[in-house]
């Protein structure tokens, strides 16, 4: 677990480094005892004097603190002992002087919170009375009134300073469908900037001649998470999601404008270990997915929730995004298409109830529009491709990368992962092994954005039992191939072999192999069918040497493509592994899990001590333009710009600008932590910035 820092660099006078510590939000607990009215009245006065400036009067949430009422807050503390609330407040609040609040004051604040809940909907009392909790007691007298909706600032200087700091919010314009189709040059409105997911910006103020003057503009500490963060920028406001928090920052200075902190159950540490790659912005709302399986729409100017939708209705919120004991993840994040919020779901190695899925929600109210399951079910097209395994023994096909979208075709494109427990594909059923391609694992899926109907699918590798997903970015690029214009979707799996498909029909066009794998020996030039290395077929108890390792020659750090030149920039690592197949009992196989194991990461044969490479390849011809190799593995996605630069970061904490034409290092800086994220570039106040999240 790390504490992420978002940093912004720009050309011009080197500004002093601004370091801000993210606000630690107050969270209270559900207690089963309701205090007497006098204590609640005293707690109300204390709250308004000492807490409301962050949490807002009336417990509704403020600019710097989460709400202390409502069902989400109640779920956060369901089943806690009666003394938990006062103990937490006394020991943890206020963040700037934790432990200084007298126990009597903490008890009074607890009483106020519980009484105020009674006046609302009793969510705290209802949750406190859940199984395993002590029963709530009836209050003897009505609770005090919750107070005004906002805290009034009476100091003229403070009010003026606050108004100036919040000024960027007033300039925010609603994001339209037209903006999403063609974003303003200075904005970064979605994961890889545009629907095409190219990771390319038309900004050129920072170019090869002046990038050496790039200097620090500001930095800002974020709540702890595992990074893979993409900041979004619109009209000079940056939106960042880290762990259980969403923050709006002034893009030019890094000032905190508002934050939303989602109250999550305390079980486990998933809020800090989750990897949500992006949010989405549309109209006057920001759409964020959280580890508890909820998608939330937030007002872009205030951070106030507009709606909150649970993707799995039977999810047990006390178990952090688990349904029927099965974990699920929203690691990709949403994309907007024709008023719908569309995202994929991954459910881990013990996939339940039809498997992973892609879902579309109505952006207006969060209601579900459609759902597409990525594991073909018995009786459906592709349902006979699982070696006769029943539906509840089909695993994988996770969707943990955001999709892309072609507005002209109204198709969204998603990649899927491999299966996990492979014995159900390899072992005979009824005396023989049946068809076992395992659809729709390792596939590109093209879905109608309005209905979720499958338009076409292409499986890149059949029956992947080596954990070599094809789940990554689906890049939409127009290329001239053999004198003919082609509208293609290009994607590469962990083996760093890239397939190009016609994005209207899914017809195979060509493949480009980066040369770091030994699984695929050849590709049919007409169909794209892969001829796999028979020496790597699983044999029980027999280790086999395979390249790449299960972490892949490439993984989640996304590629970039210059749409004008058709040059693809690919970050890769050079590792191999020994893998073993260990079949388990039929009962264990049916229950899910894994039966392929790996020895870890091993150097490639003949390795010279360099374990990472960045390659620029002409997609039209397959010609490698240049390759830059180094010892430290690359850590960030690629960011290419019209200034002739490609930005990249590595595990050795360096963030670099390279010449797109040659791979030469033009500028570099060493950060406080590895930039394991998706760099973006934007403009504000007439200046171009580059932002990257570290940690």
Label for each model-derived stretch:
Residues 48, 96-195:
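Flexible coil segments in periplasmic/lumen-exposed cytochrome c-class electron-transfer proteins
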Residues 188-192, 224-245, 270-295, 325-358, ...:
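Repeat-blade elements of multi-bladed beta-propeller folds
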Residues 38-61, 105:
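Sequence/structural segment immediately N-terminal to covalent heme-attachment motifs in c-type
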Residues 251-253, 300-302, 363-365, 449-451, ...:
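Short loop/turn segments that connect beta-strands within beta-propeller blades
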